Amino acid sequence: MEKAVSVIQPLLIFTMLFLTFCRIEPRELKPHRWHWWLLLIQGGTFVLLGIAAALILNRFPGHSDWTVLIESAMLCFICPTATAAAVVTRKLGGDVASITTYTIIINILVSILVPAIVPLVHPAADMTFFHAFSLILAKVFPLLIMPCFAAWLVRYLLPAFHRRILSYPDLAFKIWSVSLALAIAVTVKAIVHSSLSVLLLAGISAISLLCCIIQFWAGRKIGHSYGHIPGHSDNSVTAGQAIGQKNTVFAIWMGYTFLSPETSIVGGFYSIWHNLYNSWQIHRHDSES
């Protein structure tokens, strides 16, 4: 099952992003002021938690559950926006171009901050800044850039096919639903078969829930303060999804690659929380429409 999912999920994500980029004019991809506040929250919190973890390790050398919990929170904050966030944002009436722009910017920040801060917590002689930087770029950007280029080629070279794609407005959302079902199935299996103690699992679960609540709340608060976008709901929806809906598969990979392996489970827990919230938001939005 996991092997099949590892092949199918990237294809689904690529297709979702391709369909999303088909609906965005290249000139619409530009930064907004609220982007910088969200970057400050994600990057600043990650740096502060990294320093805190380093101080604890310096004072109490060795592996402990406390460092695992702090590292789990680090992952929850620095994890970039989910590639499917644009699909949910569009369903909720948000600005797809804005959240897509933020997704690109936050991935650049992650590529710089993670290699800079992780050595404070987990020094590794064979993991230089540029090695870690290249690992992250190779993991993230092909799945972001290739659908973008493919969509723009179709837009300008195959306009009839492009119009045909636009005639199926809910196709990306239906693909997201399939992708979500697969992700939840894999997540539940990983949690059930985890060898971690019940107490540590409960702690990681609580940390992931708290981080999820804080980020959705902060994003909506900041987005709302920047007013209304013509043709969309106010920025609260877009900013909330930008910082709250995470690329949890990437968080799991970062946990295994850069931090304590136990932290990788936090991506699974976060996936449950943000998808429960997304499902509730979509249900409420559809009920009010």
Where are these regions (language model features)?
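Alpha-helical transmembrane segments of multi-pass small-molecule/ion transporters
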Residues: 1-289
